[in-house]
């Protein structure tokens, strides 16, 4: 289906799935470092998680390099009572600074995703571009960057094109979905994806844009339409 729709990669696969994508003629655009039910909630904003997260990335980054997977995802984590936002940011900087040298050595980029806490991920700490940029700008590694999810940030803050133009140097990967609903990129939702894709292209971005919508009708038709809209 992906190849028929004009898609060249599949996003968010685990290491034991990367070969399946390759055999189908597809790249894995972003890989997972682990299978955990608490993957989103348990992130770098809590120092108690660092040993676990660093171990997962230390195992996965060399495998990703050998497999040709350019990005591996990580999460900021959920809020906790008694921990301020700044303490969470500081913890992220400390933990990610420890893994950045290995990411640079392997040439694999760790991408951290901001999510909306309003609709889909209540309690998630990094629910703004400001939070994400505060972290990666302090880590200051070309291999620790952000996954800018257009849907999630439209829910939380809007102003998508201006944000891309202002902060694109920190963005290594993008996700799409329609808003409201997180469904197809069609006329029932508010985001103007051709204009957004032109703004991304104008920054010189040469990575992947991944479609992460929940289909409400024929999935292949929705994917074809998304590819058509975003091909600028």
Regions found by a protein language model. Give the residues of each.
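Conserved beta-strand positions in the central sheet of alpha/beta enzyme cores
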Residues: 9-11, 29-30, 73, 111, ...
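Active-site acidic/histidine proton-transfer and metal-coordination neighborhood
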Residues: 43-145, 155
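Active-site-adjacent beta->alpha loops and helix N-cap segments on the catalytic face
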Residues: 15-26, 82, 191
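Short glycine/serine/threonine/alanine-rich loop segments
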Residues: 7, 26, 69, 108, ...
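Active-site-proximal loop/turn and secondary-structure-junction residues that shape catalytic pockets
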Residues: 14-16, 34-36, 77-80, 114-118, ...
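Catalytic domains of carbohydrate-active enzymes, especially glycoside hydrolases
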Residues: 1-20, 60, 68
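Histidine-acidic metal/acid-base catalytic patches
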Residues: 1-4, 68-70, 126-148, 152-232
């Amino acid at each position: 289906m992906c190849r028929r729709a004009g898609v060249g990669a599949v996003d968010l696969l685990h290491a034991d799935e990367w070969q399946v994508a390759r055999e189908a003629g597809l790249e894995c655009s972003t890989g997972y470092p682990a299978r955990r039910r608490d993957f989103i909630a348990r992130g770098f904003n809590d120092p108690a998680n660092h040993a676990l997260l660093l171990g997962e990335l230390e195992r996965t980054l060399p495998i990703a390099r050998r497999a040709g997977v350019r990005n591996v995802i990580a999460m900021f984590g959920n809020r906790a009572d008694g921990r301020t936002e700044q303490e969470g940011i500081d913890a992220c900087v400390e933990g990610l600074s420890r893994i950045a040298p290995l990411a640079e050595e392997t040439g694999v980029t760790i991408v951290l995703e901001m999510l909306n806490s309003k609709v889909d991920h209540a309690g998630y700490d990094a629910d703004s571009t400001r939070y994400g940029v505060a972290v990666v700008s302090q880590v200051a590694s070309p291999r620790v960057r952000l996954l800018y999810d257009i849907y999630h940030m439209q829910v939380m803050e809007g102003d998508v094109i201006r944000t891309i133009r202002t902060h694109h140097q920190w963005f290594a990967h993008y996700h799409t979905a329609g808003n409201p609903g997180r469904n197809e990129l069609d006329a029932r939702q508010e985001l103007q994806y051709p204009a957004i894709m032109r703004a991304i292209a104008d920054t010189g971005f040469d990575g992947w844009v991944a479609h992460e919508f929940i289909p409400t009708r024929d999935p292949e038709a929705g994917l074809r339409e998304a590819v058509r809209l975003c091909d600028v």
